[in-house]
């Protein structure tokens, strides 16, 4: 019997992704563009959430630390905490909970986008595992599609399989990482640091959005992920 526990996917931030454009561009402009690009992948959810992001563009002053008692004394030195503080400031500037409390439609669209990202990430990982075990993914896709539909996600049925309309990357995590990698590119060269920053961004985003699920009828991201894992485990057990 094979059980799986899914880990989150890791995104590598390539230097080519953060090269400055020819026009004179500010950090605020780049942050807005990165958000717009991500939101475009969320079909029906993209416009409303992108508008919310654009209302909260700010230029933050990063925290700096200094070496003492050596040749580099007095020079600001970037640390992981500097980058994490920057991402937290960016997230706070979006005021997700505040906007959700004023606008029920925004709250629901945010929940839909988060669950759609959970669906997409876990679907891909489960399908790879099932294929590696020689298991057909068609029944699995149909069942997790039904789970997504039962969770209240909008979407459409193609070839008998329901697919959420907003399936894709997390609309809050990706812009945070993109913005931080643009401001502190040298901190994202190391793969282990990329993984650490990605995990931190997911942690603070989930902490911010989870209360929205508690006030509604949709399952939390954790509950929805567990549902997908249980479905995948069922097909793996049948193949054993």
From Swiss-Prot:
It holds the Pfam family SecIII_SopE_N. It is found in: Secreted. SUPFAM superfamilies: SopE-like GEF domain. GO terms for molecular function: GTPase activator activity; guanyl-nucleotide exchange factor activity. One of its GO terms (cellular component) is extracellular region. Residues 78-240 are annotated as: GEF catalytic domain. Activator for CDC42 by directly engaging this Rho GTPase and acting as potent guanine nucleotide exchange factor (GEF). This activation results in actin cytoskeleton rearrangements and stimulates membrane ruffling, promoting bacterial entry into non-phagocytic cells. Also activates NF-kB, p38 and ERK kinases, which are known to be involved in the induction of IL-8 expression. Chaperone InvB is required for secretion, translocation and stabilization of intracellular levels of sopE2. SopE2 is highly conserved among Salmonella isolates of the SARA collection. This is Guanine nucleotide exchange factor sopE2.
């Amino acid at each position: 019997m094979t059980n799986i526990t899914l880990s989150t996917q890791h995104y590598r931030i390539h230097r080519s992704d953060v090269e400055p454009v020819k026009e004179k561009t500010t950090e605020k402009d780049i942050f807005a563009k990165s958000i717009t690009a991500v939101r475009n992948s969320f079909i029906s959810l993209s416009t409303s959430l992108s508008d919310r992001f654009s209302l909260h563009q700010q230029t933050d002053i990063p925290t700096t630390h200094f070496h003492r008692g050596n040749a580099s004394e007095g020079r600001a030195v970037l640390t992981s905490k500097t980058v994490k503080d920057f991402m937290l400031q960016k997230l706070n500037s979006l005021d997700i909970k505040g906007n959700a409390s004023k606008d029920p439609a925004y709250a629901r669209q945010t929940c839909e986008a988060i669950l759609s990202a959970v669906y997409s990430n876990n679907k891909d990982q489960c399908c790879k595992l099932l294929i590696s075990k020689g298991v057909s993914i068609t029944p699995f896709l149909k069942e997790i599609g039904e789970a997504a539909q039962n969770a209240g996600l909008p979407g459409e049925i193609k070839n008998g399989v329901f697919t959420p309309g907003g399936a894709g990357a997390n609309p809050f995590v990706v812009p945070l990482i993109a913005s931080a990698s643009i401001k502190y590119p040298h901190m994202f060269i190391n793969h282990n640091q990329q993984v650490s920053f990605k995990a931190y961004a997911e942690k603070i985003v989930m902490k911010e959005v989870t209360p929205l699920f508690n006030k509604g009828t949709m399952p939390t991201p954790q509950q929805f992920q567990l549902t997908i894992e249980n479905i995948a485990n069922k097909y793996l057990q049948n193949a054993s």
